[in-house]
Amino acid sequence: MSHVANKLLVTCALPYANGSIHLGHILEHIQADIWVRYQRMRGKEVHFICADDAHGTPIMLKAQQLGITPEAMIEEMSKEHQQDFAGFNISYDNYHSTHSEENRQLSTKIYLALKKNGHIKSKTISQLYDEEKGMFLPDRFVKGTCPKCKAPDQYGDNCEVCGSTYSPTELINPRSVVSGSTPVMRETEHYFFDLPAFSNMLQEWIRSGALQEQVANKMQEWFDSGLQQWDITRDAPYFGFEIPDAPGKYFYVWLDAPIGYMGSFLNLCEKRGDLSFDEFWNKESKTDLYHFIGKDIVYFHSLFWPAVLEGSEYRKPTNLFVHGYVTVNGAKMSKSRGTFITARAYLDHFDADCLRYYYAAKLSSRIDDIDLNLEDFVQRVNSDIVNKVVNLASRTAGFISKRFDGKLAANLDDAKLYQHFVDMQESIAQCFENREFGKAIREIMALADEANRYIDEKAPWVVAKQEGKEAELQAICTMGINLFRVLMTYLKPILPSLTERSEAFLQTELTWNALSQPLLNHEITKFKALFNRIEMDKANAMVEASKSTIAPVKEITGPLADAPIQETIKFDDFAKIDMRIAEIKQADFVDGSDKLLKLILDLGGETRQVFSGIRSAYPDPKVLEGRLTVMVANLAPRKMRFGISEGMVMAAGPGGEDIFLLSPDSGAKPGHQVK
């Protein structure tokens, strides 16, 4: 790849906040983290950020199914996602959410800049509408047959089989994912981003040679079929940011989602105080911006995103690093087979370094799918990490501790061999730089084989039994420890947990620059097991656990679906509310209002006037007179055009005629406090 700047901003695609992280997701975050850790080892200033993609109809509907607000759901998802990434040692500098004030401000600013520069068009469109649910259907909530390749069961925005994009109205035999009904067409006004206006700029980007060949080729296919204006609007109900000056219209999630990269970085700048947002995002920035993404979202990142940035006068990405999908045991991940494995299920059974190593061994700069074969996974981890690398230290460290009080020799037994290991750093560095992690591991394991052959030939266990061979034994074991140190330095970006334990054992930090100088006359600690073998039984247990933990979300219907439970509050906040029993002494219509009733309430020594929106439920207000009810007594008086309302009566129900005034049990009296 081309020269990397000294300052880098690196992102992973934003996980969607409606489900758990699984082993398909984690591939990308491991890939990016390895590259980031390598760049940091080489002295680069790297800012590694991510966020939850927290908007859209799927989140709104799932929260409704769960009977909670979208805000409450995405908050819990964010906590879970961050715990999972921490469990895999993903070294983010900041993890944020697209449902943030930073993202709202930036989305609005970018939209207004695009509009000012003439890149936003409006037009009336016909859109699919679910009459059963009373809502316009976003593209991901329509399924049907792809109009291009005729693949069945495809979403309304793009085909997962042929990669084509289209509008939901082009689907053959569309159906609503929400209700299963056949949608009808209705007209609505939408705003569009003028993507074709950026065709020349985007084609220059293709010809620059920076993009992966497979990405550039796919982009050319899209150009050949013609770019279309991009609908950036969604109709209410929708969980997201409302478009300025367009009530009831919301930004499509794919407009504000990539802006989430900027929002997360802005949040980091605000936290740190010593970072400049403009230095990394202004049009003339000298820094590098890299996005690690999956091949399923190339279209949005290679066309829409750079065009949106160009149109709003921000810098474009330096490059996209695209990876393929993950299969398990040669097949698509399956909940029924237990191969739909969540990050948490994996971490309950294995060290994160095991999967980091296995994925790294299979990763290249190409967009190839990766198969997680569990038998191969167990065999490779044991063969490479345990038998080849850690075993090198365990075969020599004991002699150093027992015979030489933990002190390494003053000289190496084979300085030429050590120099050969050090000389490989340039080749291995190039592999890391170019994201050819599999090649890097092959080169490192070839060195590990050489190191173990050296120990086999020198046989320190034999030398230890020979009198007068102490210096030779110390030199051989010192050599083995130093070769282990070189190998672990090369593996440091991949195996952070093992590296940390190895640094404690060696009592030195493993750095690229220190490789030229071996550890001599240096004291190490007593060797303890650095890494344990893994067993197939645990892999089988993980699969079984995954079968039992993946369960369909129980759909909540009725009142909780219509009015989800709000976010939790602290007890101290609840305790501030003073609810009292009140007798309705008088109830009358309010002139000029078809919703309100005027209630005169007796609190047992004090009278209050309250305006309540319950007229539809009580067409004869006189039936309320003499009833006891519950009121919020310490609500601040509210001035209305009909008079002052001095509290609020408590009622239940969805609204309209279905409102039911609350009444206390017998024995309660006006003025009693509700506890």
From Swiss-Prot:
Recorded hits in PROSITE patterns, A to Z, give: AA_TRNA_LIGASE_I, TRBD
Would the keyword DNA-binding be found if you checked this record's keyword annotation?
no
- Start and end residues of each tRNA-binding domain: 573-675
Q: What class of enzyme is it?
A: ligase
Q: How is the cofactor bound?
A: Binds 1 zinc ion per subunit.
Taking the record's annotation, the residue ranges forming a coiled coil are none
Q: Where does Zn(2+) bind?
A: 146, 149, 159, 162
Coordinates of motif 'HIGH' region in the sequence? 15-25
Source taxon at top rank: Bacteria
Question: Can you tell me which residues bind ATP?
Answer: 335
Q: Where is this motif: 'KMSKS' region?
A: 332-336
Cellular location(s): Cytoplasm
Q: How does it assemble?
A: Homodimer.
Sequence similarity: Belongs to the class-I aminoacyl-tRNA synthetase family. MetG type 1 subfamily.
Function text: Is required not only for elongation of protein synthesis but also for the initiation of all mRNA translation through initiator tRNA(fMet) aminoacylation.
User: Mind telling me what this protein is named?
Assistant: Methionine--tRNA ligase
User: What's the source species for this entry?
Assistant: Proteus mirabilis (strain HI4320)
